[in-house]
Every structure is written in C-alpha cells, then in structure tokens.
Amino acid sequence: PDLLATAELLHCAGRVASLVFEPCAGFEALRQDALAPQQAYADYLRGQINLQSIPLLPQAQRAAAAGDANALKEIADPLSQLVAAGVLLQTGKASPAVIGQAIDTASSQGWRRPLLAWLGVQLKRAEQGGDLQEAVRLRRRMALTQGRALPMNQPRHELLSDTQKESP
C-alpha cells in the first residue's frame, strides 16, 4: 500500500501542477493505511495542511506550505515548483510573481497542459483588471500553445471574449 499511495500522490501532484483541484480519490481509498508523511502531503495538495504537519512534507514544499510565496524560486525541481505554485493559488496566496514563475517553468519544460492552465489564470486576472491589451496577448499565446496560431492582423475585438469586447 505504501508504493501505491505514493503513486497516487504523484498522480494528484501532477494534477495540482496543472491546476486541476479535485479530491485525490485514489489516495483517499488508501489513506487509512498510508504513512503520516503521505497523509500530510495529500492534505497539502488539497490546500488543507496544518502547521504541525509541515515538517512531514518533502523539503522542497515546506516553505511554500507555510505560505512563503518567495520560496518558489528556491525549488530546483520544475514539477515541485508547479505543485507549490498550484497549492499557493489554491489557498489564495499566489502573487502575480508566482503565476509568472509558474508560466516560465511550464514553458521552459515544454509542458503544455500546465502552461495553458497558468496562462488561463493570468488571462483571467488581466480581464478582471481591465487590461485588454494583455488579455489579447495572452489569448494569442494560448492559441500558439494549443497549436493554432491567430493571425497577427486579426482585429482586436475578435480576440476578446464576448464579455470583454470593446464598445463602439
């Protein structure tokens, strides 16, 4: 059960890195027989770690689990970086710098799914902040990432979502 629990947690960590926040059902079925560090990590992935359990987490995740968004820069492993960024986002502690770093990390690794998810977060923030030029740029980047390039001369209003279209 120990190896199976670890495998389930790795699967769930990958989903958190891609901003898929859902229960880790595979692990939850094994929780009662799992080791304390595995249980702590599962709680962390849900954004529900308690302070007493932080020392049980992998070293790379401890500072981020304590809410230190600056710790992301110190995490060497790209997947661990994205997991920490995902947890920070899930708990409402992801700054624009965290989002930017997550985008850079996913992009540099060539990981399309996490990149699209993080670009989507940045797009939503740009739209909410009324930065239409940034929203257009992000939509173009997302289209390129998905393998469908948008023409550079496409009218701006066609790149905006229906709710964000400029008024005449």
Residue ranges, per PLM feature:
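Solenoid-like repeat scaffolds
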Residues: 1, 27-35, 68-76, 103-113, ...
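N-terminal Sec/ER secretory leader and immediately downstream segment
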Residues: 1-33
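Residues that mark the junctions of alpha-helical repeat units in TPR/alpha-solenoid scaffolds
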Residues: 4, 77, 95, 108, ...
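Structural register within alpha-helical repeat arrays
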Residues: 6, 11-13, 83-86, 102, ...
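Structural motif corresponding to the intra-repeat A-B loop/turn of tetratricopeptide repeats
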Residues: 14, 18, 91-93, 109, ...
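Alpha-helical solenoid repeat scaffolds, predominantly canonical TPR units
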Residues: 23-26, 98-105, 118, 138
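Extended amphipathic alpha-helical interaction segments
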Residues: 35-111
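A cross-kingdom marker for long, charged
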Residues: 122-168
